[in-house]
């Protein structure tokens, strides 16, 4: 693993180890508090005879070894053996840990060969316990905190297997325990990862490197329940975006649904547990707080329907009823609080609400009436109608269909002009001139309602104006606003790729869908599991280790071998 791009971590842990981008330092990180909180807590340096030594890194999914460049027998190796504990073994060298501290952060002796570190900025404590060997601590006190904190483990650095220590994370009090030896501790995390890897879907042989990378990223980006997180949460990344967002979670849940349905449902339930009285889901959540500043598009009923296609476990009546009630409230939020009048469609109050933050339809200002939002809501209400009928709530089933019919009529009346879909700038009730965003083609997802010629025009437009070497550009490459690295102004994104592939398949464009799926799988060989990609070179852009990219790859690869059974087609109307 290249930890300058892909953090070293493990399932359930808030610990991560990375190479810092700006300084090239090796950093131990803590992800509590989400991506607005600083994560660096210690700088690691391999030492020899009291001096920093040149080192190389040998990193697998479960071990990180810091190797003296000129003597490979001298090293420090660590594994994150449990969710809240790091084991480290040092041989023939020393390891210096220098705290990246704030004013009140303080280190104090705790017991024999133990030191407790209070991190005020992270609201956690760390216990350092030396199991074998020696340590030298330098932590001069200055009134209200240590002026600096430096721990040198195995300071003499001349003994083979000379030092073993652990770092434990907790909130309040340390619990005494018996420690495993280093090898056994590491074997435990090895087994956990291998079990996860075995659960990942099989892929065509040429994509095995992508499968292993996607498996590692999805495994290592999970954090355990704490604070606002009522269950295990698959974060979007442990690089910079370490929260769970409320549409990213849908793609990770779909991927997990076949092999780990409980964890899959948890990705949705985290947001249901904090659903506002108005019905809105939080934009994102981490252990410390949740944000309602924005929200995300209403794709959740579609995601749940896809999960049911993959695994009948989700057909349990209690699960269906609980999902229905939450999804109904979420849908009514859009209808009740985001609709300026009965003659208008619901609006996005910011590009972030759509998930397409800087798409060209938002360049004139906000709020915006967008055809993708109407289409998502129409499909969501059609699915809710099917769920209501399944739950023997006939009146509600009829009401959802009537609401979907009404919104569909408004969509075609207000946002379909001259053979194409457009967006409107709501304050002036005018059509937005920028019409080269892929988001305007999203009504393909309700192709089952559209006239066949409209569906055909959408599919043809995708191929003619958006299809590039590796897939669909988010802004047409013919547009003057197109940028190779423009976030939603050109680059390929996994979630919308999957939404369009699914829509194309359901509307009979199987060859086109398969072509896009193959292109995306090839893209991961060129650009890894990045947040988004250059459509022509395949270069990975922005965050290089993203979970929804990994999940979309795993789903597409699985579907290339075995298409999902559509035994719940009725719930898509």
Predicted regions span which residues?
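Extended glycan-interaction surfaces of carbohydrate-active proteins
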Residues: 203-241, 267-287, 339-369, 409-492, ...
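Contiguous N-terminal and early-domain "leader" segments and peripheral loops that mark the onset or edge
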Residues: 75-107, 223-265
């Amino acid at each position: 693993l290249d930890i300058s791009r892909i953090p070293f971590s493990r399932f359930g842990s808030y610990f991560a180890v990375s190479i810092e981008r700006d300084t090239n330092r090796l950093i131990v990180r803590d992800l509590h508090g989400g991506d607005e909180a600083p994560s660096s807590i210690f700088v690691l340096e391999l030492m020899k005879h009291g001096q920093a030594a040149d080192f190389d890194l040998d990193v697998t999914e479960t071990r990180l070894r810091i190797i003296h460049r000129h003597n490979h027998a001298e090293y420090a190796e660590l594994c994150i053996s449990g969710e809240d504990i790091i084991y480290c073994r040092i041989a023939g060298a020393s390891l210096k840990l220098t705290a990246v501290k704030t004013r009140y952060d303080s280190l104090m002796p705790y017991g024999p060969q133990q030191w407790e570190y209070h991190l005020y900025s992270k609201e956690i404590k760390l216990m350092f316990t030396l199991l074998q060997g020696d340590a030298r601590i330098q932590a001069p006190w200055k009134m209200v905190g240590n002026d600096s904190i430096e721990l040198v483990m195995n300071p003499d650095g001349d003994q083979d297997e000379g030092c073993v220590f652990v770092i434990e994370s907790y909130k309040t009090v340390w619990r005494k325990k018996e420690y495993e030896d280093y090898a056994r501790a590491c074997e435990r995390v090895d087994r956990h990862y291998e079990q996860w890897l075995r659960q990942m879907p099989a892929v065509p042989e040429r994509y095995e490197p992508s499968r292993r990378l996607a498996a590692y990223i999805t495994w290592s980006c999970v954090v355990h329940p704490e604070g606002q997180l009522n269950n295990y949460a698959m974060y979007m990344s442990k690089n910079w975006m370490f929260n769970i967002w409320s549409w990213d979670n849908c793609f990770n849940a779909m991927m997990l649904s076949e092999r780990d349905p409980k964890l899959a449902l948890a990705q949705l339930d985290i947001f249901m547990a904090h659903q506002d009285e108005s019905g809105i889901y939080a934009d994102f959540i981490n252990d410390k707080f949740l944000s309602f500043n924005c929200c995300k598009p209403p794709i959740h009923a579609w995601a749940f329907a896809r999960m049911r296609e993959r695994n009948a476990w989700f057909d349990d009546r209690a699960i269906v009823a609980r999902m229905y009630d939450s999804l109904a409230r979420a849908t009514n939020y859009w209808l009740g609080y985001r609709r300026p009048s009965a003659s208008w469609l619901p609006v996005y109050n910011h590009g972030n609400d759509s998930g397409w933050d800087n798409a060209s339809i938002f360049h004139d200002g906000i709020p915006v009436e967008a055809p993708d939002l109407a289409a998502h809501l129409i499909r969501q209400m059609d699915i809710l109608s099917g769920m209501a009928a399944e739950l023997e709530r006939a009146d509600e089933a009829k009401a959802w269909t009537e609401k979907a019919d009404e919104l569909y009529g408004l969509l075609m009346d207000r946002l379909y002009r001259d053979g194409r879909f457009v967006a409107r700038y709501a304050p002036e009730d005018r059509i937005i001139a920028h019409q080269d965003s892929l988001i305007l083609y999203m009504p393909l997802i309700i192709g089952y309602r559209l006239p066949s010629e409209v569906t055909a025009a959408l599919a043809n437009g995708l191929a003619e104006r958006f299809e590039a070497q590796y897939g669909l550009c988010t802004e047409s490459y013919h547009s003057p606003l197109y940028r190779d690295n423009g976030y939603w102004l050109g680059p390929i994104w996994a979630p919308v790729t999957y939404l369009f592939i699914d829509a194309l398949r359901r509307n009979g464009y199987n060859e086109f869908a398969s072509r896009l799926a193959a292109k995306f799988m090839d893209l991961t060989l060129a650009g890894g599991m990045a947040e988004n990609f250059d459509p022509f070179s395949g270069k990975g852009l922005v965050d290089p280790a993203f979970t929804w990219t990994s999940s979309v790859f795993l789903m597409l690869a699985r579907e290339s071998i075995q298409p999902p059974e559509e035994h719940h087609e009725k719930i898509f109307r």
